[in-house]
């Protein structure tokens, strides 16, 4: 594919919020359709696994080493060769690891200045919401459950170009964080999500019933808590040394999926929307996807979950979110805008 054959606005986006170096290139056409042209990801997860979690300094150095080659691969894959260049450059401005964000933001600003094109500083979490459009088309009004290693949010999304309303979030650990901690407890290593999911498939999810946090009559309907669940698993393993790890994993995973899907479906039906969107790294979990499909079908909701490729961090999702901001006539960001490691989910862009 050559760039001259692709009409529309070409967006190059950089994602470096954690341990994946992602570069995505997408095209926004005159009808608002977003088409993915390139999606390249380099990960430092193997280096991080030696330490049982993400080490910020290692992540930052890995981004420095990987970003140049990853950008060149993406440009070549999209057909941006010779003097061809994108029309817009975007980057994750937050939330994320401070040093990791700086690498991607600095590179994006430099390319924006060198090419003389606008720069968009966008929210990483908004990118997760937008990732689904590549596979399932324009996103209707929905309730979104965003679950990842560092975040667990229930959101009302009227459109990807409109302000996002936060309905609730975790009061302690994120769901993905709990997965990593329980996986470490069971000696499964890091990252814990996929390996724990694989182990849980071989266990009996009804053998051990773990507590469901924030589900009491006095609890916030849209809030989550996974710290108590993590502690309950630790105490169970300590007091039952002969327990099958697969049953522990299955019981833990069932508790997480039960709470997430129950609260998400209830929020969607309560607001009268017809679509539930589930995104983020934890959205790749097989039991969460299965239980969400069952409960959405029972409630008459349309369920949208991107494929596992678009659940984890990547540049394609940042390009998609930037495209929707462009379509909504959002102004570009100044080149002196700082990154924000604690950027709230409701702040779509810094400009």
Curated annotation (Swiss-Prot):
EC number of this enzyme: 2.3.1.234
Any one GO CC term of the record: cytoplasm
Residues given in the record as substrate binding sites: 146-150, 180, 193, 197, 285
Cellular compartment(s): Cytoplasm
Names of the cofactor(s): Fe(2+)
Pfam families: TsaD
InterPro entries with a match to the protein in the record: ATPase_NBD, Gcp-like_dom, KAE1/TsaD, Peptidase_M22_CS, TsaD
Keywords: Acyltransferase, Cytoplasm, Iron, Metal-binding, Transferase, tRNA processing
Details of cofactor binding: Binds 1 Fe(2+) ion per subunit.
Residues annotated for Fe cation binding in this entry: 124, 128, 313
Recorded superkingdom: Bacteria
Enzyme class at the top of the EC tree: transferase
Reaction equations catalysed: L-threonylcarbamoyladenylate + adenosine(37) in tRNA = N(6)-L-threonylcarbamoyladenosine(37) in tRNA + AMP + H(+)
Gene3D superfamilies assigned: 3.30.420.40
Annotated S-S bridges: none
GO molecular function: iron ion binding; N(6)-L-threonylcarbamoyladenine synthase activity
Gene Ontology biological process: tRNA threonylcarbamoyladenosine modification
Function description: Required for the formation of a threonylcarbamoyl group on adenosine at position 37 (t(6)A37) in tRNAs that read codons beginning with adenine. Is involved in the transfer of the threonylcarbamoyl moiety of threonylcarbamoyl-AMP (TC-AMP) to the N6 group of A37, together with TsaE and TsaB. TsaD likely plays a direct catalytic role in this reaction.
Similarity comment: Belongs to the KAE1 / TsaD family.
HAMAP family, per the entry: TsaD (MF_01445)
Protein name per its UniProtKB record: tRNA N6-adenosine threonylcarbamoyltransferase
Organism for this UniProt entry: Mycobacterium leprae (strain TN)
Lineage, uppermost ranks: Bacteria, Bacillati, Actinomycetota, Actinomycetes, Mycobacteriales
Gene that produces this protein: tsaD
